[in-house]
Amino acid sequence: MSPRQTVFLIAGIFSIIGIAVSVIIIAIGGGFSGASTSITDPPTDADLWRIGQKINDETELNYSLTIFGSVSSLTGAEVSINFSEGKSDDWKTNFHLINDTIAEDTTILLSKQQLIPKNSVEEEFKQYFRLIENSILSIRDIAREPKYLVIGAPWDTIFVGASSIPVKVIQKENIKTSVGNFDSFIIGYKIGSKTSKIWLTHEVPLPVKAEVYNSEGELWYRYRLIGMKL
């Protein structure tokens, strides 16, 4: 074999090794684990979840919401979120919140990219919008860019004191709701003895359900999708 042929052979071997390594990296998703990923079946763009995906003009999402807190709480509330076309890059979004003692609503412009407010919130609704932001809309904090809905996929890291806690996809589950059954993925993280869980599905632009605990292991808030029009 001539020196020139030897060089081509070595280059070909390294190319094959490089491709194999790339496939392995994709398959484990930079840290993915679990039965749903493999070298022959790596995650693709179809596995990505984007906040606000599938929102259309007149999309409506209805939730039951309860928040437990020493400073602010909300018991047995229903939250209705209605989207309509605003400008090219935002949604004109109506929020309606009601329970036994509250009946409030307001309209806010939310960015289509990340559902971030683009105008000021009316003063009388600020405290209620803060509760919605800290619960139903808090998925924005860990889905700042598209993330994989694949078991083991890392989503974020949260810090409690000196400890760093991974947030990742921990489970796949068929969840039954009043608007139908969904094949969902559970985003989870564990603080102390309690695991906080957020259920996501490709069919719904925001979480379907959540049960989130504080650092003392006490239930902080829970919500569930109870109505939907896409």
Feature roles, as predicted:
Residues V7-F8, N99, E133, A143, ...:
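Sequence-pattern detector for short linear motifs
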Residues F8, I108-L109, Q114, R130, ...:
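Acidic/proline-rich low-complexity IDRs
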Residues A20-Q114, A153-L230:
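Acidic, serine/threonine-rich low-complexity disordered tracts
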